[in-house]
């Protein structure tokens, strides 16, 4: 339950197919008066969402001269918004997601904009580097792009506020990204992975910790204050005990509200980027065997943390290799991007993204209802056919 909700960079964006609509959008159930897909949305979904301020095919962002169409920008933004809404409702089903709520001191609205920008920056840099190195699209990417009109249904494109042009741009960037990454890590490449490389990375990066968690999700400020006072009492008694480590274990087993405790009784072994930042930062600041003398607060609640010796075998070589590649490639992208000239249009900067989000979730709710009705009708027809036979 401590995993980060969004990882940075291009890889996460491309992990989900552009055409299948994996995951839930978290579309609002209070979807206004919409009962059908508006003709304006069918004509130009971005123009519909922005009340005519921006069209789907116009450039809204440039990176070193690489032009990013609105249909690519809003796909990325809509995808991240859906992911965040899904995460939020899973974390607190009693509350309603909105862009004005905060995560780690930042509104979801700003968090979405930052992630969309950084993701598209990585996409554009991949496109630029691909062009500079005269890369050609892979056969698989060509096939995907050639089949976009058939595989990316109109309602799927509307659902993610995109068009064939936006999808082609992102697919091209993704393919260049994959080729660039493969070249860096293959045998003889600049970052060729050896047994020694993985051994050093494992030694320097694998961490482990146990924690006592008291949840604060959905609690009022007054309730949070009481919970914090309670966990401070636990901490005081643990640190005053003649055997703090044993006392920590006892309180963890008796008081922790971490639902993962049953499957992780010996603590969590993890790599950088796999836990929420507050937890990870606290663990990395401790020595093995040390108990943090301070309460750590995250979006889940209040933690007491004890760093422990990691189980090195808990992280297999393939996971380690994947993490090393991802982290190293992100550093390469960051290096390529540090002097990038990034510009966004005034029309994009001036948008009320809360209003855009509200219109998008209304549209998504209608599309979901249509899909459910079609699925029910198809099942009914299939059942009828079976009975008649």
Could you describe each region identified by the protein language model?
Residues 58-64, 102-117, 126-136, 166-167, ...:
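Second-shell loop/turn segments in exported
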Residues 17-21:
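C-terminal motif of bacterial Sec signal peptides marking the signal peptidase cleavage site
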Residues 76-87, 115-136, 144-159, 179-191, ...:
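Structured segments of extracytoplasmic/periplasmic soluble domains
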């Amino acid at each position: 339950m401590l995993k980060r909700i969004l990882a940075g960079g291009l890889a996460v964006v491309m992990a989900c197919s552009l055409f299948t609509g994996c995951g839930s959008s978290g579309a609002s159930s209070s979807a206004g008066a919409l009962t059908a897909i508006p003709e304006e949305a069918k004509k130009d979904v971005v123009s519909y969402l922005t009340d005519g301020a921006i069209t789907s095919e116009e450039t809204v962002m440039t990176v070193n001269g690489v032009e990013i169409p609105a249909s690519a920008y809003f796909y990325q933004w809509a995808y991240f918004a859906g992911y965040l809404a899904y995460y939020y409702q899973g974390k607190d089903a009693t509350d309603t997601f909105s862009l004005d709520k905060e995560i780690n001191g930042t509104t979801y609205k700003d968090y979405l904009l930052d992630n969309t920008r950084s993701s598209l920056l990585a996409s554009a840099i991949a496109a630029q580097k691909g062009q500079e190195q005269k890369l050609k699209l892979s056969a698989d990417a060509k096939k995907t792009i050639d089949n976009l009109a058939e595989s990316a249904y109109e309602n799927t494109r509307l659902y993610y506020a995109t068009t064939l042009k936006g999808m082609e741009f992102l697919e091209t960037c993704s393919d260049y990204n994959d080729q660039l990454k493969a070249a860096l890590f293959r045998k003889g490449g600049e970052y060729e992975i050896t047994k020694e490389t993985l051994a050093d990375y494992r030694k320097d990066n694998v961490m482990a910790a146990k924690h006592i968690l008291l949840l604060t999700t959905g609690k009022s400020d007054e309730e949070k204050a009481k919970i914090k006072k309670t966990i401070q009492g636990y901490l005081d008694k643990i640190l005053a005990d003649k055997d703090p480590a044993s006392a920590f274990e006892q309180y963890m087993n008796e008081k922790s509200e971490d639902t993962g405790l049953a499957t992780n009784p010996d603590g969590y072994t993890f790599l950088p980027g796999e836990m929420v930042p507050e937890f990870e930062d606290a663990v990395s600041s401790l020595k093995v065997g040390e108990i943090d003398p301070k309460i750590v607060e995250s979006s889940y609640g209040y933690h007491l943390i004890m760093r422990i010796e990691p189980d090195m075998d808990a992280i297999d070589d393939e996971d380690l290799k994947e993490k090393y590649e991802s982290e190293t490639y992100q550093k390469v992208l960051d290096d390529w991007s540090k002097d990038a000239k990034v510009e966004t249009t005034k029309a994009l900067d001036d948008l009320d993204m809360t209003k855009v989000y509200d219109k998008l979730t209304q549209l998504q709710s209608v599309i979901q209802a249509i899909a459910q009705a079609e699925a029910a009708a198809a099942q009914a027809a299939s059942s009828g056919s079976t009975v008649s036979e």
